Amino acid sequence: MVGLGACTLTGVTLIFLLLPRSLESCGHIEISPPVVRLGDPVLASCTISPNCSKLDQQAKILWRLQDEPIQPGDRQHHLPDGTQESLITLPHLNYTQAFLFCLVPWEDSVQLLDQAELHAGYPPASPSNLSCLMHLTTNSLVCQWEPGPETHLPTSFILKSFRSRADCQYQGDTIPDCVAKKRQNNCSIPRKNLLLYQYMAIWVQAENMLGSSESPKLCLDPMDVVKLEPPMLQALDIGPDVVSHQPGCLWLSWKPWKPSEYMEQECELRYQPQLKGANWTLVFHLPSSKDQFELCGLHQAPVYTLQMRCIRSSLPGFWSPWSPGLQLRPTMKAPTIRLDTWCQKKQLDPGTVSVQLFWKPTPLQEDSGQIQGYLLSWSSPDHQGQDIHLCNTTQLSCIFLLPSEAQNVTLVAYNKAGTSSPTTVVFLENEGPAVTGLHAMAQDLNTIWVDWEAPSLLPQGYLIEWEMSSPSYNNSYKSWMIEPNGNITGILLKDNINPFQLYRITVAPLYPGIVGPPVNVYTFAGERAPPHAPALHLKHVGTTWAQLEWVPEAPRLGMIPLTHYTIFWADAGDHSFSVTLNISLHDFVLKHLEPASLYHVYLMATSRAGSTNSTGLTLRTLDPSDLNIFLGILCLVLLSTTCVVTWLCCKRRGKTSFWSDVPDPAHSSLSSWLPTIMTEETFQLPSFWDSSVPSITKITELEEDKKPTHWDSESSGNGSLPALVQAYVLQGDPREISNQSQPPSRTGDQVLYGQVLESPTSPGVMQYIRSDSTQPLLGGPTPSPKSYENIWFHSRPQETFVPQPPNQEDDCVFGPPFDFPLFQGLQVHGVEEQGGF
């Protein structure tokens, strides 16, 4: 069952196949006619038998053509026998092959009753271009034709013929027909059905279901359409005496195909050198058989290809196919060339020189002979005129070793026929003036123009040499040429020039017997844009400006110089700007930018060959608020630094204003300040003793007590002394100097305060009070320093000393402070510092 709106060809066919036999026999389709011309109308009828009980007697008959929509018939009626019939006319059948279906409604779908196949096409056109050939190989007459347009219908082609006389106006015996195979446009009449040398009429008949047609009749004699087979070519072996006298010739022979030996034939020979772009050359009116044929005047090509074909002589017929190609090498003649040479020498040691010789053959005539190799030799005086072969090569260069005294070598080109005229190569010295102003420039991708200024001495010619200057290129091969005209100052190099390669070009002038010094220049073949542009770097940026910099590429050999730079920048709104800069600039400042904005910048490097862009650089200008914050932080840091420095300076100055800058004796190594032997000094205490009191005779060094002790601060008479006098009590004549020496102190030991032990004239032992002060000596009383003990001093009984008032005439109670031994080492800055005490 198939839906009414979706009934397809596959669906209805499947339903038809699955129908029961009783339902299948209910309907029947008739087509009139079943095959029509494409586009013609088709009449069809569908009948339903009255014996079909499964269908309603009033069922409506429907039609469907191929995949087109279902449609009712043109007219439906009942026949007298109760059969229902539906008629339909298809106005245009546009299918070459289609199915027509007869349907009836069945519940919610349609039921297939019957189907019929329709065919449409065209009647066959008359075949054309009928031709026949008599093949002696198959011994049959083979005819072929063109069938004409496609008919879309099965069409058969029949080759018909009959024997006749004269111009085929009289029909004789009929020859059996030849039916061509399907989709073949030829047919053969065997030899047994043919009468040679008798005319026959031949034509082709085409037939299909819509009609038939015939080609025009062809009247011929089978022997007039004979197609021969090609002859057999052979090469002849000629003796060497003939070859040497006749260079540039070929010798060959041929024989006709054996079945056609009895026929008179005329042949053609064609030959072609195996060279690019060479054409065939024809030789006409040759006989069908030749035991020896000489073909001369050939160019010195490596190999020639020869072919031959034949036709019946003086009679109608067809040319045979060309014979298979025969490859022959023409006889040679000795090369007739001029050898241009150029050499380079290198001294290996005092007795040996290495020579690299280049040469180039120049033909002296159109047919200069084939070259099979080059022979380079040297005549050594030690070998009594016998030549020493240095090189035997097919290349155009050779490297060899010679004694330093060798002056020349001999070069010849050779082949089987002989050698060319010898060329003497003289080793020239590099003397004479060189060319100046050498310049090279690429004209296009495969040519380079080279020019120069002629030297002061006009040369006979110039040697131009060029080679690739690349690490990956083999420098052993060089291209070179000799310009024989010394007046020329420029030349175009065309050979062996590859695009976009760096070339080293050398020009040397040629003088009689010498060659000038070579001059080099480098250039590229075919200029192109620089490979890359310098990379941009952001140096500084502000709110409305940005400074850019770049590093130019280092120049290289042959490098095309840049002409200028161009900087392009664009903002986020695709507003682009540009500026062109001189090639000497390496930085640039972009101005008038928007604050806090993004910009895309790139640099373009330009030469005369093109331009190349650098990689893009993206920058962002500063925001004014960010700049203010930055400046505020900077000012705050500077202010803080200034305050700290000022505070430190003021602190040091305040400390100096309270006391002098004197080291602390208790925490200093004063031993290094004192001399090794300390001079005893006489200390005086004014107004305490008279002039008869002897001076101090001995000063001992006290040791530091492990357990600190304190002097009796309540000794009698101390209260009346000044504070400074309480710290140190001295005796002796102030003008008297003791000559006794102090024992040397150890280096690094602390220098302790001294104590007077005894005096010969002293009425009693006096006790001296040590100060515990660790501060520099001041004018007022200070705390006592750490006490020190002396064993001998403590063993004596303590005595009280009552001081007297000081003499007002003295400037100091106990003289200048530097009279005290412990202050001798403080005299390091001069006497001018005494005011600090």
From Swiss-Prot:
Residues 651-837 are cytoplasmic. Residues 26-118 form the Ig-like C2-type domain. The WSXWS motif appears to be necessary for proper protein folding and thereby efficient intracellular transport and cell-surface receptor binding. The box 1 motif is required for JAK interaction and/or activation. Its main location: membrane. GO terms for cellular component: endocytic vesicle membrane; plasma membrane. Keywords: Cell adhesion, Disulfide bond, Glycoprotein, Immunoglobulin domain, Membrane, Receptor, Repeat, Signal, Transmembrane, Transmembrane helix. Disulfide bonds join 26-52, 46-102, 132-143, 168-219, 178-187, 249-296, 267-310. Residues 126-231, 236-331, 334-433, 434-529, 530-624 form the Fibronectin type-III domain. SUPFAM superfamilies: Fibronectin type III, Immunoglobulin. The chain crosses the membrane at residues 627-650. GO terms for biological process: amelogenesis; cell adhesion; neutrophil chemotaxis; regulation of myeloid cell differentiation. Found in bone marrow. It holds the Pfam family Lep_receptor_Ig. A motif (Box 1 motif) lies at residues 658-666. Receptor for granulocyte colony-stimulating factor (CSF3). In addition it may function in some adhesion or recognition events at the cell surface. Glycans are attached at residues 51, 94, 129, 186, 279, 392, 408, 474, 487, 582, 613. It is found in: Membrane. Belongs to the type I cytokine receptor family. Type 2 subfamily. The lineage of its organism: Eukaryota, Metazoa, Chordata, Craniata, Vertebrata. Homodimer. The dimeric receptor binds two CSF3 molecules. Interacts with CEACAM1; down-regulates the CSF3R-STAT3 pathway through recruitment of PTPN6 that dephosphorylates CSF3R. It is a single-pass type I membrane protein. This is Granulocyte colony-stimulating factor receptor. A motif (WSXWS motif) lies at residues 319-323. PROSITE patterns: FN3, HEMATOPO_REC_L_F2. N-glycosylated. One of its GO terms (molecular function) is cytokine receptor activity. Residues 26-626 are extracellular.
